[in-house]
């Protein structure tokens, strides 16, 4: 086959450790905002809603019986960059799958919304470390439309690099792995175990890193080995952390689950944990849980003294073939079809389709926080006469990392086996 006859390959990668995003402080009068500022904020709210919707849909379709850990925001970010180049049937399918049509999110407001969230996402904070980055690598003999390139650079802050996938594949592989390692503080040191195929013409990357510390840290002296029931049935011994304190908490009868919020320092970001009352109740919880029901649940949490027992855990997940299959089952089929993909908005021609999409995540939760470093002393003794509610996560549970002001779900996952 001649090179000119090939449908060129486009690859998408999302790399993350953890992330946080914050939107504008909406306390001032919106009627006095410039129109463009108002559109950015409205766009950012719609980006939040669609990102959360997409995350829940993908979580449901991954249909894994083991651990799950995904970043809805990271996936939504890279899919948005791709969507802006989609046309025809491919665009319509992405509209439905990503939820854009349900909130009337057009391309211009999508760009403004992501621009707004990215500006604040990368704002400096003394309470946590955060980095996020977008990158697009282009075969140096390949042409993309100038307006598309400028949009990614100006609105998404993407670093656009010319590379040689054809003649210097191994060098490009090393460059990509070095970029990934740098952006994730070496938490994900290698993405590519082998060079990309020579027919690759574009590769999108999104990398995010978050390092947070609990507002109230667990006392490591209280951590002990205890039983966790893998998949709700199989007992195993794991390190369990203990903490007594006042936290937002509730029992939700409609979900037959306990809900607990553990804030990170600064209270801008929290971990939400949903624990089924029944040891094998995770499937029922996931069936009844949605983005809207989560919002309803968290709005009804009340601060109360709780004895918390949760496992230390580390999850490292990679999604590739199963991610592609899930997106196709959700309705995004033409994007991966050599015959039917339409990404004319990227090149001006129908010469691209997606051959590979990779989503890699890593999270570590310990006494200090989420991949926190350093040692601190915390007074968190447990009284023998404690009569307050308990939250004992000794069987499968669902968790979310959420930005509290915006409501955006940064990460979501299931701890099923340790």
From Swiss-Prot:
Disulfide bonds: none
GO BP annotations, alphabetical order: negative regulation of serine-type endopeptidase activity
Site (Reactive bond): 383-384
InterPro entries: Serpin_CS, Serpin_dom, Serpin_fam, Serpin_sf, Serpin_sf_1, Serpin_sf_2
Subcellular location, record wording: Secreted
Keyword flag Secreted: yes
Classification of source organism: Eukaryota, Metazoa, Ecdysozoa, Arthropoda, Chelicerata
GO molecular function: serine-type endopeptidase inhibitor activity
CDD domains: serpinJ_IRS-2-like (cd19577)
Provenance organism: Tachypleus tridentatus
Keywords (A to Z) from UniProt: Glycoprotein, Protease inhibitor, Secreted, Serine protease inhibitor, Signal
Name recorded for this polypeptide: Intracellular coagulation inhibitor 1
Protein family: Belongs to the serpin family.
Tissue: Expressed in hemocytes (at protein level).
Modification comment: N-glycosylated.
GO cellular component: extracellular space
Signal sequence annotation: 1-24
UniProt-annotated glycosylation sites, renumbered to this chain: 49, 404
Known role: Serine protease inhibitor that specifically inhibits clotting factor C. Does not inhibit clotting factor B or proclotting enzyme.
């Amino acid at each position: 086959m001649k090179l000119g006859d090939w449908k060129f390959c486009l690859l998408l990668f999302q790399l993350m450790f953890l992330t946080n995003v914050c939107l504008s402080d909406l306390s001032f009068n919106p009627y006095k905002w410039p129109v463009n500022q108002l559109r950015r904020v409205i766009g950012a709210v719609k980006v939040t809603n669609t990102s959360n919707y997409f995350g829940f849909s993908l979580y449901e379709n991954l249909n894994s019986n083991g651990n799950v850990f995904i970043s809805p925001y990271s996936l939504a970010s890279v899919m948005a960059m791709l969507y802006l180049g989609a046309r025809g049937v491919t665009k319509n399918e992405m509209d439905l799958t990503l939820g854009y049509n349900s909130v009337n999110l057009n391309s211009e407001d999508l760009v403004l919304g992501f621009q707004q969230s990215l500006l604040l996402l990368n704002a400096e904070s003394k309470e946590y470390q955060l980095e996020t980055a977008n990158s697009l690598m282009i075969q140096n003999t390949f042409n993309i439309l100038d307006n598309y390139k400028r949009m990614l650079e100006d609105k998404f802050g993407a670093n656009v690099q010319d590379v040689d996938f054809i003649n210097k594949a191994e060098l490009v592989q090393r460059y990509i792995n070095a970029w990934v390692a740098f952006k994730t503080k070496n938490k994900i040191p290698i993405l590519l175990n082998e060079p990309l195929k020579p027919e690759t013409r574009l590769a999108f990357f999104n990398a995010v890193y978050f390092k947070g510390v609990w507002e109230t840290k667990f006392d490591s002296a209280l951590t002990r080995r205890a039983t966790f029931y893998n998949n709700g049935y199989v007992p195993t011994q794991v390190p369990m952390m203990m903490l007594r304190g006042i936290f937002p908490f509730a029992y939700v009868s409609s979900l037959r689950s306990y809900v607990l919020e553990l804030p990170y320092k600064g209270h801008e970001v929290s971990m939400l944990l949903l624990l089924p009352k029944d040891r094998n109740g995770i499937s029922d919880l996931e069936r009844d849980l949605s983005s809207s029901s989560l919002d309803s649940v968290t709005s009804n949490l009340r601060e109360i003294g709780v004895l918390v027992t949760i496992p230390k855990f580390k999850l490292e997940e990679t999604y590739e073939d199963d991610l592609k299959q899930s997106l196709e089952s959700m309705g995004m089929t033409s994007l991966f079809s050599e015959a039917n993909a339409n990404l004319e908005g990227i090149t001006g021609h129908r010469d691209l389709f997606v051959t590979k999409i990779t989503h890699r995540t890593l999270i570590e939760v310990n006494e200090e926080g989420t991949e926190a470093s350093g040692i601190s002393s915390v007074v968190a003794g447990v009284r023998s006469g404690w009569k307050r509610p308990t939250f004992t996560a000794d069987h499968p549970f669902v968790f979310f990392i959420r930005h509290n002001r915006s409501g955006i779900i940064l990460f979501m996952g299931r701890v099923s086996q340790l």
